[in-house]
């Protein structure tokens, strides 16, 4: 099975080099590596000139193609005809040596699988369940012999009956599912949502759909939107055998006010892609959760040192929510 790796990057030459060095150590190597660079300087190009990698092609995108969503589509348009699978990785990730081998093995495992994602092992918070210990159903999520300590927002959702009754990676009718991922148990799980830091799809998916123009710019939740639309062609899964490290880099994020608006408006958009006509109960829950999460973010004004960020994001969330009454996002 031939596969292409696409990395969309912006002003991160050193993290990109670290990623590519981890690609070089893979047990199976990509047939193509496309670097889609939206940087406004030549540092990334220079570092790739000084560090050669097999099968790598570098593309400096023009200004009109900058931004994650546009760069993804730009890369897809340049994939070779022999490719069966297109893999995307964030430029701030580092792979375990068998990452690609496990991704490709998962596609071989079931022809109905069209999307596969791995897991970031440095973000794992799952712990083995102790046999004789009782865990609060409000403070812990129990799953297949493991427990996951809930954060403040999920504890409140548990208490208020606003938690999803579906497994991780699944989107309930009111949209807000569990984001805890899966324990490292070497299993494969079917999901609705794959995370853009590490997802791969069969090329047939890209022959039919592309990343949505709605998310051009920062692209918050564009991966969720694409994952949902990809399900018309087959199943999405997460394999806990495909492991990587993810080092979140905050650069490139819009100001907190705009980010707060995006959280609500883009969240509404993705919800309606999956559920165009949700029930009245689901609508009620979605709105209550928006209010709850906005209140929690507002409380950060008094509980964290980054008070200005908390205040402006809260305002963005409020404005984003109110705007839905007269200006809903359009597909």
Which residue ranges define each predicted feature?
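Short, well-formed alpha-helical segments that are part of the catalytic scaffolds
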Residues: 12-26
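A conserved acidic beta->alpha catalytic loop
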Residues: 29, 35-46, 93-95
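Glycine-rich, basic loop-to-helix element that forms the pyrophosphate-binding segment
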Residues: 62-81
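Short beta-strand-to-loop acidic/aromatic patch adjacent to the donor-nucleotide binding site
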Residues: 82-94
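Conserved donor NDP-sugar-binding/catalytic core segment of glycosyltransferases
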Residues: 98-166
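A recurrent flexible, glycine/aromatic-enriched loop bordering the glycosyltransferase active site
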Residues: 158-171, 181-200, 231, 253
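A short, conserved alpha-helix in the catalytic core of glycosyltransferases
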Residues: 185-186, 192-209, 216-242
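Active-site-adjacent helix/loop segment of glycosyltransferases
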Residues: 236-309
